[in-house]
């Protein structure tokens, strides 16, 4: 279990947020509803989805490294 207020927790939350937004970008109904706004508070979801789709290899490698760290080293 990771604590949200630690650096590990922030990294896990960020990776999960980026992965979730990238997945929601592939769902047509949610894409038009959630990711249509590119500015403001709702723009954070759009920007995370863009990061997740453009850097999918880096995000996947980061998720694997974080999973290895949390399971075996922490």
UniProtKB/Swiss-Prot annotation:
Membrane spanning stretches: 53-73
Signal sequence extent: 1-22
Bilayer topology annotation: Single-pass type I membrane protein
Keywords assigned: Golgi apparatus, Membrane, Signal, Transmembrane, Transmembrane helix
Subcellular location: Golgi apparatus membrane
Extracellular side: 23-52
Cytoplasmic side: 74
Pfam families xref list: DUF1242 (PF06842)
One GO CC annotation: Golgi membrane
Known role: Involved in the early part of the secretory pathway.
Family designation: Belongs to the KISH family.
Protein name: Protein kish-B
Name of the coding gene: tmem167b
């Amino acid at each position: 279990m990771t604590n949200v207020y630690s650096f590990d927790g922030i990294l896990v939350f960020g990776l999960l947020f980026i992965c979730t937004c990238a997945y929601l970008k592939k769902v047509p109904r949610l894409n038009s509803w959630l990711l249509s706004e590119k500015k403001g508070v709702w723009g954070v979801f759009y920007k995370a989805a863009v990061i997740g789709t453009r850097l999918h290899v880096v995000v996947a490698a980061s998720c694997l490294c974080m999973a290895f760290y949390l399971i075996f080293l922490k």
